[in-house]
Amino acid sequence: MFHSDSAFATLTSQTLTHEQKLMNLAKEAENAFDVLDIPPRTRHFFETGAINDLFEGHAPYRPRYILPDYGAFVRQGSAFLRLPPPQDLDELLFSLMTLYRHVPSITNFPVYLGNLDTLIDPFLDGWSDEEARRKLRLFLNYLDRTITDSFCHANLGPAATRAGRLLLEVLAEVQNTVPNFTLKYDPEVTPDAFAEAAIRCSLACSNPALCSHPANRDTFDDYGVSSCYNILPIRGGAYTLTRVTLTRLVDDARGVEHFMEELLPECLRLTADYMNERIRFLVEQSGFFPSSFLVQEGLISADRFLPMFGVTGLAEAVNHLLRDRGLVYGRDGEADALGVRRRSTPW
């Protein structure tokens, strides 16, 4: 259903920028469609807030998170963007800035900018540190001023590089909000001095975070840390992210057994069905994959995307179910046991 009052409020807002108005009005138009097959019981869980689509909208027309293969882009350029493979640092940064403008996501901005140090390092020959820092400063400030959403991520490491060192120096200096950075840390590869430089930088500007490269490198053949620290396959990403909010679901429970054996399994099954329906529409009807130059040029592939599922409110749900007995999650053993209890019969 189209909500004209909400759209008009967006249209006449004096607090939103022009770009924010465009995105909000587009969301109003998207939500006017009813193209997904959603059964009544699933709609009930949406109405109560037990299932949350995290602002993905009623008619998915792009994946939630996209992680292009920026290395392939640098090697081959882009016919669609009429960009040849970059030959020097200026061309590299210009090419990346151009491509970022064309990488969609749920936020309408790129959520992943690549392993910037390994992309940049081969192009630093012939530039002094000061010259390179000036170019990187302009590059990072461009990202911060044009990607106006904090769910955006760049990666470093695990190996130390000159580009990585310079990026850390500039990050600490500019104190920008966007993008977030994560260092892929591997004790067998990452020198202590580089890890210490990353920690000092993080103390100065809250970037980069650190992730365990050994713990994550075998999950996918190549991965990136994207958006709000989501680890996903390069050349793919996440089709969708749907969350179950236990604090809302528990309001429908008649007791512990009803919640564990009936209500929670039903909600999870319907959540999975809903995610499948979103993916079906996105892949089969939206036209995104047949039309995107990111697909045509090999920067992403539909078989590299996966669904994401979230859950929140565990402690609150346990406390609600055991409130009559005064048991509290994190303090009482029986409450903690309920938090990790499995259904008694197979799913």
What are these regions (language model features)?
Residues 111, 301-317:
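Conserved phosphate/anionic-ligand binding catalytic regions in large, soluble enzymes, centered on
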Residues 2-303, 324, 330-338, 342-346:
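Conserved catalytic cores of very large enzyme subunits
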Residues 316-324:
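Well-ordered alpha-helical scaffold segments within catalytic/enzyme domains
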